[in-house]
A protein has these predicted regions:
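Vicinal oxygen chelate
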Residues: 1-29, 31-42, 73-74, 93-119, 122-180
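Histidine-centered active-site/metal-ligand motif
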Residues: 35, 82-84, 100, 131-133
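Core segments of cupin and vicinal oxygen chelate
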Residues: 39-81
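Conserved active-site tyrosine of GNAT-family acetyltransferases
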Residues: 47-52, 118, 141, 146-147
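Generic beta-strand/beta-sheet core signal
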Residues: 62, 76-78, 87-89, 106, ...
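A short beta-turn/loop motif at secondary-structure boundaries
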Residues: 65-67, 92-93, 130-134
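Flexible internal linker/loop segments at domain or repeat junctions
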Residues: 78-98
């Protein structure tokens, strides 16, 4: 065919060889902060009990160790599967370390677009992937300004059942619990 090929200028050229121009770029554009994930040197069950008894959180999902202790707890005061997640790390330098802050996107397509934007801007990320716990899709990246780990998060499920029974996970199930 005789046709002129569109050539992008150096400023608008994509790093993706099969795409002429960079992705439309007004940032990843999250809708809201979704949740925070904390690491703690305190036993997770102790932390989770405090959040339930003193703060009114509901336990949604948890990881139980063979000795009955919790290694992780996903909790919320809203219909979200979690507003906060708490994980036990005996080597955490304090009782409360931010593991990540999660931002919500509308759908999986927005998550894939976010991956393109991060790649175009030279920001290293992990994902996209899917968590078994929470049934959500994710990308993890480090905020180059603050050094804080961010999760770009979508899907998941909402809980409207007043008699919700927390989902128990074991260490043997972490190959699908954390990511697949």
């Amino acid at each position: 065919f005789e046709m002129e090929k569109t050539l992008a200028s150096a400023e608008t050229r994509s790093v993706l060889k099969n795409q002429t121009h960079r992705s439309w770029n007004r940032g990843v554009s999250p809708r809201r902060i979704d949740h925070v994930n904390l690491l703690s040197s305190l036993p997770t069950k102790e932390f989770a009990d405090f959040l339930q008894e003193q703060m009114g959180f509901n336990l949604r999902e948890y990881i139980e160790a063979p000795d009955g202790s919790y290694l992780g707890a996903w909790m919320s005061v809203t219909p979200l599967v979690h507003d906060i997640a708490v994980s036990f790390d005996p080597n955490a330098p304090s009782t409360h370390e931010v593991h990540h802050i999660a931002y919500w996107l509308d759908n999986a397509q927005d998550l894939l677009r976010a991956a393109d934007i991060l790649k175009e801007n030279g920001i290293y990320f992990k994902g996209p992937g899917k968590h078994g716990i929470s049934q959500a899709m994710y990308i993890y990246a480090i905020d180059p300004g603050s050094g804080v780990r961010l999760e770009i998060f979508t899907n998941g499920y909402l809980i409207f059942e007043p008699d919700w029974e927390p989902i128990r996970w074991t260490l043997d199930e972490m190959d699908i619990g954390f990511t697949y």
